[in-house]
Amino acid sequence: NHHPVVHTIILGSLVKLGIKLFSSLNAGLFIYSIIQTIILVSTLSYTIKFMKDINVSLKYRKICLLIYSLVPVFPLYAMSPVKDVIFGCLIIIYIISFYKLINLKGKLKIKDMVMEILLIILIILFRNNGFHIVLFSLFFLLFLGRQNIFKYIIIICITITFYYSYNNVILPHFKITNGSIREVLSVPFQQTARYVKEYKKEVTSDEKKAIDKLLNYDTIASRYNPALADPVKNEFNRYYTDDDLKNYFKVWFTQLKKHPLVYVEATIANTYGYIYPVETNWYVHIKGKKIINNYGFDYHFNKKLRPLRMVLGGFAITFPYIPFIGLLINIGFNTWILLFMLSYLFYRKKYKDIILFIPSFLILLV
């Protein structure tokens, strides 16, 4: 379940459908991409309708529509067969539903309660950390009025029950393993790699053995990339034991006491792009390695459409460097927008509306 099973089933089924109907892997991916595009377009359209429902000025709705239409991140994600697109749509719908719950005047209808539960289940199914994002934000509903508190408790209980039943009963029943723990250990792994790179002579033989049990000590320094955790964590030993993990963290803590600054440097180097607007972490794959073709498939680009593909790809690659408007797809800039809006709500003492930002900040954190 490292890559969510539900998304794998959907993507795999549609690829198989394309192969069965048209003898083409490309056709299957096209079917999936069209369905995903419809989902994204429908979600973005819903945001504009919702803005109208809460009396947002037509001027701002038009600006939103222009951004959706012209900023390349939206069409590129629409056609990318990855779990994050549908998950992103679900989070948008969840935040809107969260707004409605926060501003609910009367009793929560059973129909709306069921729809909220179904939405939460989908979020959990499409992203492993979706559970934490939803659960933490749901708890704040308990402080917003007694009228619906029992129903909110039911929603929270069902959310927790489903999450643990799915991961501890349903997936094991079908012999599906949970995602690797390495995903939540990116930060300490990067810190260890930087420590080894900078203070290799100080690493004892016992420390080497403890690190090697998890991360292949011999190559960890050369694999270390300050801005990217994948090269280090990709060598994680999936056959580790609890003792291996315990011994590693003993070493991690010992090295922290010796050189705490290197841990701080490693963390900043790996995360500063999330808060630094000058940094551009934007890449577009116009063409790439078709690894899937090594396994009996025939995935290829349409050669006749290459000129159009190059024009659209060129626009996408250039967009981040267009003055001012290029910042729209800059992660650091968007983080500062969130912080600015949060500060504004504090200034205006709109404390209830601050709760709406919890899912967005949790996504940044996890």
Predicted regions and their residues:
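Extracytoplasmic catalytic/substrate-binding loops of multi-pass membrane glycan-assembly enzymes
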Residues: 1-14, 27
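Transmembrane-helix signature of polytopic, membrane-embedded enzymes
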Residues: 44-70, 88-89, 355
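Membrane-interface alpha helices of multi-pass inner-membrane proteins
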Residues: 112-127, 138-141, 156-163
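Transmembrane-helix motifs of polytopic, lipid-linked glycan transferases
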Residues: 34-55, 93, 340
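Short acidic/glycine- and proline-prone juxtamembrane loop motifs at membrane-interface regions
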Residues: 79-86, 126
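Membrane-interface anchor segments at the N-terminal boundary of transmembrane helices
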Residues: 27-31, 35, 269-361
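Short helix- or helix-capping micro-motifs
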Residues: 61-72, 92, 96, 120-124
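Membrane-proximal stem/loop segments at transmembrane-domain junctions that anchor or position
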Residues: 176-304
